[in-house]
């Protein structure tokens, strides 16, 4: 399974907070048999020194959804950006209760709306 590391995403030497996230994705047998590409996407970002965000998306897995791999990538990008914005707003909170309330009330609809807009823009760019 090929693995890669983008050095631009690594913290500078001597950084106080160091997170390490390993991700992997395997092309399934059905995708191999039908020639479909891997439609999985994952993104991991350190949004604050004390907060690491991970987003995972799985494509539709059908030839009819030929943009599915791109849609998955857009989904994890949008999710990490939205989580980063949420983390910035919640910086002063000391308990999980406000985070849960904010996440359920605003984060999921924000991700969905931003993802749909990103997909529309991506389709229009083709």
Q: Model segments located where?
A:
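PP2C/PPM-type serine/threonine phosphatase catalytic domain
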Residues: 1-126
């Amino acid at each position: 399974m090929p693995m890669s590391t983008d050095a631009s995403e690594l913290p500078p030497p001597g950084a106080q907070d160091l997170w390490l996230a390993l991700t992997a994705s395997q092309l399934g047998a059905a995708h191999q048999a039908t020639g479909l590409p891997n439609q999985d996407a994952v993104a991991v970002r350190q949004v604050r020194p004390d907060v690491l965000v991970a987003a995972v998306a799985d494509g539709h897995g059908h030839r009819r959804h030929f943009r599915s791999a791109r849609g998955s990538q857009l989904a994890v990008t949008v999710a990490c950006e939205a989580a980063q914005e949420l983390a910035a707003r919640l910086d002063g909170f000391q308990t999980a209760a406000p985070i849960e309330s904010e996440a359920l009330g605003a984060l999921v609809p924000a991700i969905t709306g931003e993802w749909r807009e990103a997909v529309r823009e991506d389709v229009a760019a083709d």
